[in-house]
């Protein structure tokens, strides 16, 4: 506006009436998005919206579900320094070139094996992106490969070759590579004829699989110069950072060898890990075009490293998952004559063979409609390949490959009759399939890749009169359980059908729950394949349907089936979706098959040692096996990690300390100040603000190091909300804190985890009575260090604060490697000031916050040669703030990190004098 409202001496300046409507709508802007198929679509957003709002609009427009692979690239960027729309930043701060603006929808992350993409839509977008990059010369391609690629692109677009339609020269208007000629198009037309019968999706998959072998596949290039001012290109890919001179790779730095990545002004640094023979750190430096391009390169390196480390799941980890989740007993020495059933849903086999001799009486396949959205099969599945289906061999050591032919809509039931003997013997497998039968024989009885645990017996029970099987759970399965019960049973099989172990440590229970009027079942889950942990019930709301159904759902129950669907290969969010989808069925009933640990009386335990395995030692009076020494405690921890008992102990520890009141957090005026309604501070340890409104969701957490006269003080708090930033900075001011530790990014997986409560340098920001200025920002691959100047606007006093933000934690689960995290914790320790508290927060202020407090406490104990009992540390934290260290995966991660610090000597012992 050219004029403003001003009150001068009671008079108001005149305003042009044409300006008034602009005042109301000036924040709404138009963004033009160029899609990969050439379509341009406009979207309306406000300048105050974050980039995530626009990203969500684009994803919803395309119907994309695997959103993490894509992004929006700025149109005005040079190819020398690509820049992407940031999800957590406001649009007005990113698109400063005026409106309407133009952005390009592109693939951001190219995974090494696109065959693992789950959705056909994602593969199609990969295809379009690769085709465009080759066509425009961004992805260089040898001529012979370009001909083959173009032929698959033609098959995808035109379908099968038809001589009556496709006359010579029918590709004259098509464009595949720069500087193509008629000879090139003639070769493409000739090769097109050979692809007859390929579907569009299959042709595109063939295209992708050839394109991924190209030298620059998935490489994001940034222009730079070496220290002699010679031009080069820095490429970022899934495996690390490469340096190119005249498009020839001269150096490559794998992520595993990179200690950290940093920049200062327009200099970019790669810090490599020291080799055994080296005495000092090796640093590689480059000159970028300017500060902005240097920061773009650093940011892209961090995002690529974080993305591909989170995606990486080692084969041995997958084996651990299958071992952890496979149903059955660990005891293979006892003889079992009972029949028992295992169910295969969606093509995944549960215990298809026994470690010992096991004969399979019959297998029957029954097609059932899927009540949940099916998962698109991988390209590797033989049923998607073109003319490469191999004959199925009769050997049962190929049983895993046979199972890939099962479609997602088939429910397969295996009925085994086990006869376990001490010695191994051959077993025969007969498979009844329609329309033909095949005989399978097993020569390798171990079948370790098919089964990890052996089932022993089943104690099922019959259906009660009038009861019915849940949706997706076949009645024949329940009947089979009924028939094999020893001596029959009067229990209701629709309620209790069990896969009991010989030692009775767990069994399966079928639970039916009908939602309440609001459509809620009343329980929370944690875990999932993305979190590398089984799905476990973490909380039951009192008087909810889950609490009042018979049999009732219990905390700690492991979810096995949801309405007959195997969920062992699904992520946490997918499982939540399946549960919500059950409300849309005719019965609205949720049928859960859960694994529950059996409760044994004390008389059932043969020894005190066996009793101690059930109840954690740290919960009873401490009596460590290795004595009260650091070495003994580490031996005990290592043994517990190998056996899995540390996780059992952790799950049995109370989440909230009994008897501690939580009242102030639940007052009406304070409810909207809590990010999560169930993560609240105790009254006795909450942080009180100065003034009338004294509430903030924050707790004092003091960790005493015994025999060292040392107390590490923390303030654990949630990530600030937009309307609680003033209270957050008031805590910093009241406590005169000099260090803030942030353990999350602003958004993760499209969800806001924390409001940005600090300004970008050199901007300033006002919160309440405080003026915050970010004076500097130093970035590495794992964390960002900022220096803040906080000024009290009433008194003019100033206070300097260091802000550390850890950015290497993956969006879900825990890091695969603890190196970056341990380096970060050491840096935090180096900045700690005497007895001053350190303010630590993540999103809720309990999970990653608890991991950091546990790790620093363990390091302090290690350097003083004192024993470390992680469960004791967690209990002490939970006595001061509920639910510290939120998940089993976090607890396992920090336990493994503690053991690594001890075994590798990453913390030096202090001189006892």
Curated annotation (Swiss-Prot):
User: Low complexity composition bias: which ranges?
Assistant: 454-470
What gene is behind this protein? PTPN3
Which species is this UniProt entry from? Homo sapiens
Q: Which UniProt keywords apply?
A: Cell membrane, Cytoplasm, Cytoskeleton, Hydrolase, Membrane, Phosphoprotein, Protein phosphatase
Task: Give the family, as the similarity comment puts it.
Answer: Belongs to the protein-tyrosine phosphatase family. Non-receptor class subfamily.
Q: Where, per UniProt, does this protein localize?
A: Cell membrane; Cytoplasm, Cytoskeleton
Protein's name according to its UniProt entry: Tyrosine-protein phosphatase non-receptor type 3
Q: Where in this protein does the record say Phosphothreonine is found?
A: 376
Q: Where is the composition biased (Basic residues)?
A: 382-393
For the keyword Cell membrane, the answer is yes
What processes does the entry annotate via GO biological process terms?
MAPK cascade; negative regulation of epidermal growth factor receptor signaling pathway; negative regulation of membrane protein ectodomain proteolysis; negative regulation of mitotic cell cycle; regulation of membrane depolarization during action potential; regulation of sodium ion transmembrane transport
| Ranges of residues in domain PDZ | 510-582
**Major location, coarse class?**
membrane
One GO molecular-function annotation for this sequence?
A: protein tyrosine phosphatase activity
Catalysed reaction, written as an equation: O-phospho-L-tyrosyl-[protein] + H2O = L-tyrosyl-[protein] + phosphate
Please name one Pfam family that this protein belongs to. Answer: FERM_N
């Amino acid at each position: 506006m050219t004029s403003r409202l001003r009150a001068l001496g009671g008079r108001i300046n005149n305003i042009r009436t044409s300006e008034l409507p602009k005042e109301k709508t000036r924040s709404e802007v138009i963004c033009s998005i160029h899609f990969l198929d050439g379509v341009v679509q406009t979207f309306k957003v406000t300048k105050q919206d974050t980039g995530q709002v626009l990203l969500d609009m684009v994803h919803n427009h395309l119907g994309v579900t695997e959103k993490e692979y894509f992004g929006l690239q700025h149109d005005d960027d040079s190819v020398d320094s690509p820049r992407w729309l940031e999800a957590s930043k406001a649009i007005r701060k990113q698109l400063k070139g005026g409106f309407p603006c133009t952005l390009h929808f592109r693939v951001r992350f190219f995974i090494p094996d696109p065959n693992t993409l789950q959705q056909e839509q994602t593969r199609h977008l990969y295809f379009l992106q690769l085709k465009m990059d080759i066509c425009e010369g961004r992805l260089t391609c040898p001529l012979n490969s370009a001909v083959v690629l173009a032929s698959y692109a033609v098959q995808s677009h035109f379908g099968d070759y038809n001589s009556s339609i496709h006359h010579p020269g029918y590709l004259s208007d098509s464009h595949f590579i720069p500087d193509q000629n008629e000879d090139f198009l003639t070769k493409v037309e000739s090769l097109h004829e050979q692809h007859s019968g390929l579907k569009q999706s299959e042709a595109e998959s063939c295209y992708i699989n050839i394109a991924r072998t190209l030298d620059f596949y998935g490489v994001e290039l940034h222009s730079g110069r070496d220290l002699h001012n010679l031009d080069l290109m820095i490429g970022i890919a899934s495996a690390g950072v490469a340096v190119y001179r005249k498009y020839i790779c001269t150096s490559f730095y794998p992520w595993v060898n990179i200690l950290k990545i940093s920049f200062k002004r327009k200099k970019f640094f790669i810090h490599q890990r020291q080799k055994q023979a080296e005495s000092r750190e090796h640093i590689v430096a480059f000159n970028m075009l300017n500060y902005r391009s240097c920061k773009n390169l650093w940011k892209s390196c961090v995002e690529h490293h974080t993305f591909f480390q989170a995606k990486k799941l080692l084969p041995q980890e997958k084996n651990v998952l299958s071992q952890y989740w496979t149903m059955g007993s660990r005891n293979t020495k006892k003889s079992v004559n009972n029949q028992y059933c295992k169910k295969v849903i969606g093509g995944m086999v549960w215990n298809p063979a026994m470690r010992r001799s096991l004969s399979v009486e019959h297998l029957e396949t029954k097609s059932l409609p899927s009540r949940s959205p099916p998962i698109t099969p991988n390209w590797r599945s033989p049923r998607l390949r073109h003319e490469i289906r191999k004959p199925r061999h009769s050997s049962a050591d190929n049983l895993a490959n046979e199972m890939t032919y099962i479609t997602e809509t088939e429910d397969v039931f295996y009925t085994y009759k086990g006869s376990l003997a001490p010695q191994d013997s051959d077993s025969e497998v007969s498979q009844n399939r329609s329309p033909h039968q095949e005989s399978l024989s097993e020569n390798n009885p171990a079948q370790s890749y098919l089964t990890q645990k052996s089932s022993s017996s089943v104690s099922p029970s019959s259906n009660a009169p009038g009861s019915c099987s849940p949706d997706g759970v076949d009645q024949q399965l329940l009947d089979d359980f009924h028939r094999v019960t020893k001596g029959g049973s009067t229990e209701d099989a629709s309620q209790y059908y069990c896969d009991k172990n010989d030692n009775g440590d767990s069994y399966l229970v079928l639970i039916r729950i009908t939602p309440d009027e609001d459509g809620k079942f009343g329980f929370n889950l944690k875990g999932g394949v993305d979190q590398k942990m089984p799905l476990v019930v973490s909380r039951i709301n009192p008087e909810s349907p889950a609490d009042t159904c018979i049999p009732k759902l219990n905390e700690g129950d492991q979810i096995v089936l949801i309405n007959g669907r195997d969920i062992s290969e699904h992520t946490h969010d997918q499982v939540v979706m399946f549960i919500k989808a059950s409300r849309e069925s005719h019965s609205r009933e949720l049928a859960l098959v859960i694994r529950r640990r059996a409760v044994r009386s004390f008389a059932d335990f043969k020894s005190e040692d066996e009793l101690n395995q059930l109840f954690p030692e740290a919960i009873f009076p401490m009596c460590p096996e290795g004595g009260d020494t650091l070495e003994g405690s580490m031996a005990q921890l290592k043994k517990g990690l190998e056996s899995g008992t540390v996780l059992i102990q952790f799950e049995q520890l109370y989440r909230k300390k009994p008897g501690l009141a939580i009242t102030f957090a639940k007052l009406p005026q304070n409810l909207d100040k809590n990010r999560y309604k169930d993560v609240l501070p105790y009254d006795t340890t909450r942080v009180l603000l100065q003034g009338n409104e004294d509430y903030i969701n924050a707790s004092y957490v003091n960790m005493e190091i015994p025999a060292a006269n040392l107390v590490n003080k923390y303030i654990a708090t949630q990530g600030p909300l937009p309307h609680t930033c003033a209270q957050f900075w008031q805590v910093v001011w009241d406590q005169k804190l000099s260090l803030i530790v942030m353990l999350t990014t602003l958004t993760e997986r499209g969800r806001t985890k924390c409001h940005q409560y600090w300004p970008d340098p050199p901007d300033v920001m006002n919160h309440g009575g405080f003026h915050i200025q970010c004076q500097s920002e130093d970035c590495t691959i794992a964390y960002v260090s900022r220096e803040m100047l906080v000024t009290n606007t009433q008194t003019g006093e100033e206070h300097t604060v260091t802000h550390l933000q850890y950015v290497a934690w993956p969006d879900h689960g825990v890091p695969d490697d603890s190196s970056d995290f341990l380096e970060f914790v050491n840096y935090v320790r180096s900045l700690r000031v005497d007895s001053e508290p350190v303010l630590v927060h993540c999103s809720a202020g309990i999970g990653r916050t608890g991991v950091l407090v546990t790790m620093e406490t363990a390091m302090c104990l290690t350097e003083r040669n004192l024993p470390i009992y992680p469960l004791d540390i967690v209990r002490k934290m939970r006595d001061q703030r509920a639910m510290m260290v939120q998940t089993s995966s976090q607890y396992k991660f920090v336990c493994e990190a503690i053991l690594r610090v001890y075994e590798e000597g990453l913390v030096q012992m202090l001189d006892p004098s």
